[in-house]
């Protein structure tokens, strides 16, 4: 995102252009205000107001590490095998992922395995729904912004054609008219589009890790040998990453 902005700015300067000439308040109102208004009409206001948390997590959040998660689960399986599953209650502080904590606590409490799976699956589905909702808003903004950019351009052309008696104003008028199209394209292709794609990728990563956790918790509760737990969980990883973990072990 930052690289794209820097590249565009550098291209403007290197081309001899003045970045300040690309700032037009009426165009900003048409594109940004129009897009915001359309989003408010299409989605609940609460969801829109929370979109910044989704954006920050997608851009600045650290990606979950499935390999480390597997190592942690295998370690907990070894403890449960050696000291009994109840001993895991003394190692809750070592569990970095709250999802693991919830699963292990239910296993320690003797909760029915099917109920544990149902609860964890429901939480995973809720996570996926939240991510899908955030991505849908960003995708919608990416579709709407170019449309409002075109609306602004058409408005500018109409105003320009109404003043055809002054030929000297045609060039500047056309330039201002096209600025709104540029704003819409930038919003769609530099801001909302890339962030939505990254959110989709981050969602896949989190779903993978939580799927691994569910499988690990169920395997630990059933009393599987730690080697069996590791073998089960490694099947979720790509072959190259799986081989690297096996060699390290």
Segments (PLM) and residue ranges:
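Helix-termination/interfacial motifs at the ends of transmembrane alpha-helices
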Residues: 2, 6-19, 125-202
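Large intracellular
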Residues: 10-135, 205-249
